Amino acid sequence: MSDERYQSRYGRYDSGRGGRSGYYSNYQNSSHHRSNDGPNTNTHGPSNGNGNSGGYYHGYYNRHGSMNGRAASSGRGYYGGHNTHITSAPHNNPNAYSRAPATGNTSYTGSYYSRGGNSSGRGGYSSYNRGGYHASHQYNNGGYYHRNNNYNSSYTERQKSVSGDSATSGGMKYTSSHRTTHVTHPAHPPITIQRSGSNGNGVAQGNASSGEVPTAPRRETTAQNNGRDKREEQLKKYGISNMAQGYLEIMDQNSSSTTSVTQTEIELDEKLREMNSQVFRTMCELALVENQYTRDTLNVQLTQEKLDTLLLS
């Protein structure tokens, strides 16, 4: 392959550029991480690390399967701008991930860039502690897994050894730890319950220590008293002393009232029918009178014509 070039998703294979052969890669961040003064072009080969390349990382895979290069940007949000050794592998070579990555502020596993303000961490997260959370990303035989290495959260419950009553000596304490933060929460103070006095409704209660029986509180309310007084007034109004008898008598009175109303309705219906009949008779009489009037008018006209005929003859 003298001058053959292959383009793939991992970069471009170029065997005729400057005597180097291997995979070239150009890692480009999203548009909101690129600087305005950097180039927006695909530059092959490692960068010198001195210019503002606008958020690119330029590197290449050598023949031995590792990526060597230099960060093109020294600002935050990318690799630290120092000489960086990336432990990665060329295409279709999963065995290259078996070598453990180097440690230090400039050693990264994989091609993930740091998003934090300090690029001295490992993997995709920087050493900047966002709420006490760190993550380490490593390759495992061509795969990718996630490991939480610096996050610790525990919640323990300890029984405090005390002598005497535990309610008066503090009882149980709860401890929680999150990284270096250690907080001890004291137990709640004991609650004392009084068993003598008033129940809140003005009714005196008995003393449990002396064996007195507490007085049962009254459950009557003002609305209940008003309703009962109203019923008693109604019964007195009708002269009724027994509740059941009062209900029966009230029902009888209501029935009598209903019967009276029904009878009155029947009588009114009969009177209405009589009035309708009388109106109909009156209308018929008026029709007869009108017919008689028409007949009399015709008779008068006929008589007048006869008189005119006699006078002309």
Curated annotation (Swiss-Prot):
Subcellular location: Nucleus
Disulfide bond entries: none
Listed Low complexity bias regions: 38-50, 144-155
Keyword Transcription regulation: yes
GO biological-process terms attached to the record: chromatin organization
Task performed by this protein: Involved in transcriptional activation. Also required for ubiquitination of histone H2B to form H2BK123ub1. H2BK123ub1 gives a specific tag for epigenetic transcriptional activation, telomeric silencing, and is also a prerequisite for H3K4me and H3K79me formation. Its precise role in H2BK123ub1 formation however is unclear.
The name this protein goes by in its record: Transcriptional regulatory protein LGE1
Lineage of source species: Eukaryota, Fungi, Dikarya, Ascomycota, Saccharomycotina
Gene giving rise to this polypeptide: LGE1
